């Protein structure tokens, strides 16, 4: 478990919520802000942080999507769905507007990047989880071939077409 997940278990899972259809995008933004402020005030996440959000699926799927979004996507990567990509940028700006910065001090650098992964869910309720990944996310990706050749990649490209839901059916 990351520090943010272990700490949130102690504080009654403030990184997970069941949203209702009437909550809409505003409900997503409100829960995001509630979580970021709680993490920042208590020092539960290393600020500035990479934020991963899982939306949809069952509770366990939602948590996995959020962790993958935080830990596996590289900074600057955008969701292939244009509306989700816009929401990622909007939440990043929103997180940086709360007046908290590095180590919980006053500032405008709470969020380095915000990544969202979406899963299928029932229309009666929508799971949402928020996860913080430390700024010092050290990672290297290499592929070892059968002939002994090693190739390194800058982008780990974890999300295949099979793993990622490419589009969301938006209701007008």
Model-derived features with residue positions:
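Internal alpha/beta scaffold segment
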Residues: 12-44
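Active-site loops and adjacent core secondary-structure elements that bind or stabilize anionic groups
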Residues: 10, 116-122, 126, 132-140, ...
């Amino acid at each position: 478990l990351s520090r943010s997940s272990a700490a949130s278990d102690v504080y009654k899972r403030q990184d997970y919520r069941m949203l209702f259809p009437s909550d809409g995008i505003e409900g997503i933004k409100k829960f995001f802000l509630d979580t970021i402020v709680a993490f920042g005030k208590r020092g539960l996440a290393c600020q500035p942080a990479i934020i991963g959000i899982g939306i949809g699926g069952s509770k366990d799927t939602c948590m996995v999507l959020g962790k993958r979004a935080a830990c596996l996507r590289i900074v600057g990567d955008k969701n292939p769905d244009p509306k989700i990509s816009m929401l990622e940028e909007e939440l990043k700006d929103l997180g940086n507007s709360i007046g908290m910065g590095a180590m919980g001090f006053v500032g405008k650098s709470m969020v380095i990047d915000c990544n969202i992964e979406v899963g299928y869910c029932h229309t009666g309720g929508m799971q949402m989880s928020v996860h913080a990944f430390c700024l010092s996310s050290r990672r290297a990706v290499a592929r070892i071939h059968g002939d002994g050749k090693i190739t390194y990649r800058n982008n780990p490209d974890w999300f295949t077409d099979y793993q990622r839901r490419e589009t969301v059916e938006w209701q007008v």
